[in-house]
């Protein structure tokens, strides 16, 4: 266990470059194409003919590939939040669960595991690691109340999956988040040198951006403080009007003196912009229907 990000397994074992991350994704993509060449047959409602039509979605399309399907990524984000809020689980544990999910799905396909059971297990493990453990039966009961078709009543299924999850994570379970960096940034900005106090509205918006960033790959690529600074810069640009030149100047001076890599900051901002662009097109009915067909192999709700 490491109290410092700089000495942590997160930095030394689970931090990728953009090139190495792309290679990992490509390896999984090729494996999926080999294992599931038949694609997925789904029932689609043809509005013109006003009837149900069965069609095949080739495995080479982006659907159900976690690295390419933003619909799936956003849906996973909502699944974690929904179960977490039912049990009043701390935000830190929920985002740790999301990091576990991202790491796991870098090495395993959604097509070969039960996504709903995976998410339940990620939350169960994250709560133990973040020292806010949940009773396994309570967690499984809540998960079953949300997704009864996909979560088995046998709690040992979660404990079995937990061993599989830990193995894929190589037992590196400590995750450092940008929230602590944000606290340090807030304290530094309020010092006499910068004389800038972040408002409650600014802090809330930065927190929201950090929360949403877990839907992207930035936590596999960059240090927590870089993500926190990127979200600070984004909120500063949104909130402060051109006439607030002093406030912008103080924040820009702070960012410059941190010597953070501005290319990384720009990439994180681009990832967030791309995420929100896809969020506007989010189609929950479609992804739910695809997963229903994938896991249950029976009549599915029509995809609108």
From Swiss-Prot:
Pfam families: Cyclin_N
Gene Ontology biological process terms, A to Z: regulation of transcription by RNA polymerase II
GO cellular component, one term: nucleus
Keyword presence, Nucleus: yes
Subcellular location: Nucleus
SMART domains: CYCLIN
Domain Cyclin N-terminal: 43-174
Keywords, in A-Z order: Activator, Cyclin, Nucleus, Repressor, Transcription, Transcription regulation
Major site of localization recorded for this protein: nucleus
GO molecular function, one term: cyclin-dependent protein serine/threonine kinase regulator activity
Subunit note: Component of the SRB8-11 complex, a regulatory module of the Mediator complex.
Family: Belongs to the cyclin family. Cyclin C subfamily.
UniProt function note: Component of the SRB8-11 complex. The SRB8-11 complex is a regulatory module of the Mediator complex which is itself involved in regulation of basal and activated RNA polymerase II-dependent transcription. The SRB8-11 complex may be involved in the transcriptional repression of a subset of genes regulated by Mediator. It may inhibit the association of the Mediator complex with RNA polymerase II to form the holoenzyme complex. The SRB8-11 complex phosphorylates the C-terminal domain (CTD) of the largest subunit of RNA polymerase II.
PANTHER family referenced in this protein's UniProt entry, alphabetically: CYCLIN (PTHR10026)
Protein name: RNA polymerase II holoenzyme cyclin-like subunit
